[in-house]
Amino acid sequence: MARGRIRSKLRLSHIYTFGCLRPSADEGQDPHPIQGPGFSRTVYCNQPHMHKKKPLKYRSNYVSTTRYNLITFFPKCLYEQFHRAANFYFLVAAILSVFPLSPFNKWSMIAPLVFVVGLSMLKEALEDWSRFMQDVKINASKVYVHKSDGEFRRRKWKKISVGDIVKVEKDGFFPADLLLLSSSYEDGICYVETMNLDGETNLKVKRSLEVTLSLDDYDSFKDFTGIIRCEDPNPSLYTFVGNLEYERQIFPLDPSQILLRDSKLRNTPYVYGVVVFTGHDTKVMQNSTKSPSKRSRIEKTMDYIIYTLLVLLILISCISSSGFAWETKFHMPKWWYLRPEEPENLTNPSNPVYAGFVHLITALLLYGYLIPISLYVSIEVVKVLQASFINKDLHMYDSESGVPAHARTSNLNEELGQVDTILSDKTGTLTCNQMDFLKCSIAGTSYGVRSSEVEVAAAQQMAVDLDEHGEVSSRTSTPRAQARDIEVESSITPRIPIKGFGFEDIRLMDGNWLREPHTDDILLFFRILAICHTAIPELNEETGKYTYEAESPDEASFLTAASEFGFVFFKRTQSSVYVHERLSHSGQTIEREYKVLNLLDFTSKRKRMSVVVRDEEGQILLLCKGADSIIFERLAKNGKVYLGPTTKHLNEYGEAGLRTLALSYRKLDEEEYSAWNAEFHKAKTSIGSDRDELLERISDMIEKDLILVGATAVEDKLQKGVPQCIDKLAQAGLKLWVLTGDKMETAINIGYSCSLLRQGMKQICITVVNSEGASQDAKAVKDNILNQITKAVQMVKLEKDPHAAFALIIDGKTLTYALEDEMKYQFLALAVDCASVICCRVSPKQKALVTRLVKEGTGKITLAIGDGANDVGMIQEADIGVGISGVEGMQAVMASDFSIAQFRFLERLLVVHGHWCYKRIAQMICYFFYKNIAFGLTLFYFEAFTGFSGQSVYNDYYLLLFNVVLTSLPVIALGVFEQDVSSEICLQFPALYQQGKKNLFFDWYRILGWMGNGVYSSLVIFFLNIGIIYEQAFRVSGQTADMDAVGTTMFTCIIWAVNVQIALTVSHFTWIQHVLIWGSIGLWYLFVALYGMMPPSLSGNIYRILVEILAPAPIYWIATFLVTVTTVLPYFAHISFQRFLHPLDHHIIQEIKYYKRDVEDRRMWTRERTKAREKTKIGFTARVDAKIRHLRSKLNKKQSNMSQFSTQDTMSPRSV
């Protein structure tokens, strides 16, 4: 294959840093010792047939995220269904109903159970089918695989085997964990994006072994064979130990040769690799856990309620069986007319114990209506409908990507309303991975007039808040005017948007910088931007402009900015970079060559990057950019001329949420450079464990006596609405933790951008402190970390300022120790006391462990949100997992419970849908238990009234229809349509969310209250009916009512009472609820009428009962009215007194809206909105509150000074 054009572009190994330099195989580097447990994997390269039999047969590349398969669906799903207490009880009841002891027809017990369980299993099947189809899509992706004939043909991912040679092309994802053999570049270099693994968008450089570089075309693979001996599958993303046996030599392998599944090939036309790990053996899948079957807290509490009712059921059944035994022993001899012709043990007075035991089974079945069999299926239906509302909410539809919100499981809808802590990924979740060059400081002058997103949003919020507080006098400019000024600032001049460049300032554009003072410094600033990097230019033939593939988006934005300023980096060779420089107003450019002598790369430890170049005049320059704290401490005495104003500008940029770097340079003479370069070359070609440390020490020798030129300010573009969303969630009382694989500096900058951090907030950084030159032992490190945590806890507790806010920042290495058993709860205690928590450089496994710690340590509901494969473990570990369905992969979405297109939609998902779903489900369940207790206990009272005979007062069909038809639809409507307040009010009053977080509507106080209401209703329904009807003339002819007439009258009262009760419960009526509530009552009368018209062989004692017996009797209608009113009167009185004496927040809002006070009295409405904010220390609101306190402090100080001055002025005549 022709490779000349690609080879001529770059020989990267000559210009890359010591981190990219590769010792030759003959330089004596020893292979890794591969032996012992954990190092048993053997891979035969290009010989996949060797892996078809054990022990070399490894897992296939098929990946599954489903909970069930064809074999396990029925047993596993049935287990899940009968794991529920109520379903298990009704399974036992259905089995017992087959025997003659049952007081009901067997189908009246079996049919509802089959319907309920079948519907739930169908829902589970449909949801798992959705996961299966997404798996099919991923597994059906194709990649080129080498065949024995030397050709590469496309094959599905799932059919790839260990040992296969695959070819991955540019912008393709790696289908498995591969060993890089060669790339389209002759140096075997390729760029990889690992955002799906560690969240970082910075491109990583991978490089093959020198010995495999010749494998560069199809023919070269015909006879290629080799053996890889390496570590077993493990979750560590950043380590790999192995050896390659090739051409009778052994070559050591390290992570720089490994291409991980779900990472993406960038800036490289193609690579060849051999498959080492497949499917669930890959590191990304090792970092994920099996998709768990999650249950909400409310559902778990519901089980305890059912256990309580089961205890009540067993108690009254024992009372009933004891009563029956008593009646059998002492009264059965007198009741000769009840004895059967053939004696039975059941009625034998000489054996009452046996009679009582047998009757116990009858009683357990008879009183089973205390347990609501339709509760689970009704909740399933309601949750599915709630989920459909989430899916169809246009306010959570992203028009740009065309992606709506999606509830991938409906089991956790109500959990959305009870979240305490949100654990969020950063890259791709909070940010859009887009850096814009926005401002800069050069030679002590700040340039760039556009405002950052943070400044604009904060100014708008401050304008609103200051207006509400009435803080600004009419003589000064209004906050709204100030906000308008900032908005105008942010959109000065309409121009074609340029990716990576949001700068606007006429002083530097179009060559105007030549008129500025300090032109030499400005020229140096631009040259540092254009030269100090490792990027590769690519010409866009359509636009004629260059784009840049860089290791970091910051670097790409610097080059774009330099290009817009007139310094276009357009070419790189193995030893030089070329820049077109515009040095005049005419627009003409000069091509200049800068020879790259050395490049000292950026690392998280160094926090800086330098390049040593020789310009065309022969001058040697060290150009350096890095963190301001690092650069400032390396400045020469004469290099601090601009230190003061630059520091001031950096603070301003930081307050604006911008990422900053300081730029500096140093001139080197030939002699000094030559001496240093000899040492540097010696260090970078050395082989040993201390190589990196040696290189750092030698780099420090040259990176000193720097001269400060200026600083850059780059905006890490947040996703649209992120700061506002975080602010609203904070007002709702939610805590937010950020878990990211990024560097600490990057994470801190994002924290400022989205107002998780702010100026004045005290930062607690927990890090591992190593001794110079030597690593500490594990115990010393643990003691050090524990000491840091203990001191931080004391500092937080001793803080007396109520407005003080703390932010905890910890890196992944330190977190490894902090999550160990002896320390994790101290760490958690510190973290929960901090306003915000940021964990940096964390692995996917650590994300999951932190989530587990918060979930189990606090006992509160956690929500994890992320967009990449590196977030899967965290998403699955949390009580609720939310996936961002971005452009990079679907792993997070596939593992999630809910998916949204943008982070900002989380606000509506929680504050609106979460609040509604929690309240709906809570009220629905409480009502369900109320109506079943009210109904079920009447059976017990009738039993006691009739000598515990085991006879039901209600017809079998009444019992069958009560839960399934006559009372199910109104309660489903309650669970689907109920709204205490509208969605707009939920967003305006975010503190309403605290009702769910505090579980106000499903605590035991409220549950027992509803159960007590059910007991009261049952007493009224039975005894008031008996009092009205018993021994009274029921018909005109003077006849009394029989059992069926009494039972039908009582059942009518129950239908009326429970439906009127639900009508009083509803806050938001729709026509559907009216139809279902009053229609259920009408349906009852229709059923009784039609059922009574059937032949007596079918209707039995119900024959024409409504038409001929009940309807003509006035006492029937009087009893219905009196019983219904008496039943609901206490609840009506309760809700009335509560609204008058102890109203809840939503009661006040409902009243304000009903009387339209929000329109007539805006000041009261604003005051109520302000009160409805949860006191928070993060977000725009906290930032604005801090600003208001600052303004008040300044005003009070000014008034105090004026008062003192006035006092001195009045006293001065006396002193004369």
From Swiss-Prot:
Its placement in the membrane is given as: Multi-pass membrane protein
What cellular component terms from Gene Ontology apply here? endoplasmic reticulum; plasma membrane
Binding-site list for Mg(2+): D867, D871
Q: What's the top EC group for this one?
A: translocase
UniProt keyword annotation of Cytoplasm present: no
Enzyme active site: D425 (4-aspartylphosphate intermediate)
Chief location of this protein?
A: membrane
Q: State the Pfam families in the record.
A: Cation_ATPase, PhoLip_ATPase_C, PhoLip_ATPase_N
The subcellular location is: Membrane
User: Which segments sit on the Cytoplasmic face?
Assistant: 1-74, 124-305, 378-922, 977-1006, 1066-1071, 1135-1216
Q: Which family does it belong to?
A: Belongs to the cation transport ATPase (P-type) (TC 3.A.3) family. Type IV subfamily.
Q: Which PANTHER family does the UniProt entry name for this protein? A: PHOSPHOLIPID-TRANSPORTING ATPASE 4-RELATED, PROBABLE PHOSPHOLIPID-TRANSPORTING ATPASE
Stated name of the protein: Probable phospholipid-transporting ATPase 4
